[in-house]
């Protein structure tokens, strides 16, 4: 589903395309058979018919030499506008008819469809609602040629915000939309009686949700891109959902994690199309806008139930654990709940069932175990970080940061692109701007306190953003859009504050003054290094700024690319330096957001031989660069996404064989079975594709090649996801094997050998080996092994770092 994209790239001349180029004398001479009557002393004429030299004609009122008041304009290609004019542009109530058969009836302003109006295209797609500058904007009601209907909020030509989409087959979605797709919180109800309420992303179930079948069974858990992913609970038909679970679901609705049906119904009822008054007694519109109006997009909300195969399997498996013949009554009778029917606690990995625990339906209201379980589920459902909202300690700081970045990018983007010069580097290549709360001639009013904004080397960072193909508008929307940032707890000892953009593309970190000086000093060499080595694994920097509130300390920020921006779930995160002193996580409870360290790593990762050689070569180049800059204390940030282990894939095969008969009664997408069966082969590499390939937002360089497909460039194909582009440090498939003797280091979620996808890069590259670090080295060497501490000179640090990384990625003798 998508709205018509009528982006009016209409010039002023096109919007006034009529008789404004003719003088009054020429108008009179053009009237071969028409008539002109003087209607007032202000030179207003009433033209019966004026034939222009190019074959187009106008009849109506003129003021001077432009249309003013009611008039009709006919273009040479058959397009007709009949309605009100002002200063030569369509303005007021009017009707426009295209040669293709499309028409618009409604309000115009300044030559654009603007206000309330009804548009019908040549294929009988009908939209009735609000317009803004030729785009659907506001409340609107659209009927598609196939009978689908969407009513709700539109922004810039696309469904955005609360709305209701009804398919021709009577399936209904009620909830949030974004970019014309189901995104946010919403409920989809099928005509069969099944329903899903929860979070959506790009038209797919994504996040916490509840899937309920028509027979009363339900699954409460998390999804990733349409597939179950993580822990959840399955309640078969006839099972009463525990009171604690009901409290948990209600709490999620209050917090906005699940959709609030009462609120959605209120929103839906408020979208009353009868209240959208559209004037139809006059006809109007401009030709320049019409051409773009024809270019409608055919994208629509996808209703393919790509999860329904596993749903059917789940039904049968769940029924297999208990005699449901005693729980399911004859049709038409009320449901009876059986306390002895078990509840299935399950864990999935990207749609694959990896563990299952049968528990008795005997939760009490005051069960401590149940409360702990649901408190843990709520914690797992949350995104990493703390949402910065009004009242948060960092709220004013976030507002100032967003306002400053918006100002900086808006100021520098119009400047013509050019090569970076020597004068663009250094502390002097910066500018100040004061942002008073009430606003100024240069800055808008805002809700934060007065502050001063300093932007360092804006031309250099603009060049870096362009180098990584980051669009200026996307950059601003990601950091400074309507969504707030999330504050992350500092994983290290620096005490830095970390912000994460809501779309997870960018990290923002506070820096010490000394770190800013280091970055400015090394920025020319950093820029040259990144430009020369497009596969570099060093942190990508996109902006350096400083905020000085009117009352308070200075804050210095650097904007970086998030190395873990991916649709795949990062199950483990490691910060690896090669040292051993104090290099283990001190958290008792380890979750997916815990940053583990060198001594916590109990797996080796085996890559294809050529990939390993390329990775180690690039790491050596990068570490030598940092050594030349007198930098130490950096680390390799490693993210691990793991797939289902081999021995569990056979369980899926057995489950599918059990459910052969049951699947016949469910309408499925035939491709799903093939997708799920592909797990048996582990990670699948396919020759590179030109379409539907997901790339990272900050990726440069060539793709990796695989000997298995004739040394061609390859993509990674995973069930339930798009093709992932494999590059150095991004979407790298590997085999993880347990290191002997390290089995009990942490609770194992991986197995002895399993498939993984790796994400990695070098971070924390702003620590010089200065006098402070030299003193730290001397002091710690008196108490500990000098080779085990982090504070060592850059040359030794680089050597030790590379030796350790070689052990993490040993030579693959099986490839």
Curated annotation (Swiss-Prot):
Catalytic activity, as annotated: a 1,2-diacyl-sn-glycero-3-phospho-(1D-myo-inositol 4-phosphate) + ATP = a 1,2-diacyl-sn-glycero-3-phospho-(1D-myo-inositol-4,5-bisphosphate) + ADP + H(+)
A Pfam family per the record: PIP5K
Gene3D superfamilies for the chain: 2-Layer Sandwich, Histone H3 K4-specific methyltransferase SET7/9 N-terminal domain, Phosphatidylinositol Phosphate Kinase II Beta
GO molecular function: 1-phosphatidylinositol-4-phosphate 5-kinase activity; ATP binding
Enzyme class: transferase
PROSITE patterns: PIPK
Localization per Swiss-Prot or TrEMBL: Membrane; Nucleus
Start and end residues of each PIPK domain: 391-809
Transmembrane parts of this sequence: none
Membrane topology reported for the UniProt record: Peripheral membrane protein
Quaternary context: Interacts with CINV1.
Protein name: Phosphatidylinositol 4-phosphate 5-kinase 9
Classification of source organism: Eukaryota, Viridiplantae, Streptophyta, Embryophyta, Tracheophyta
Gene: PIP5K9
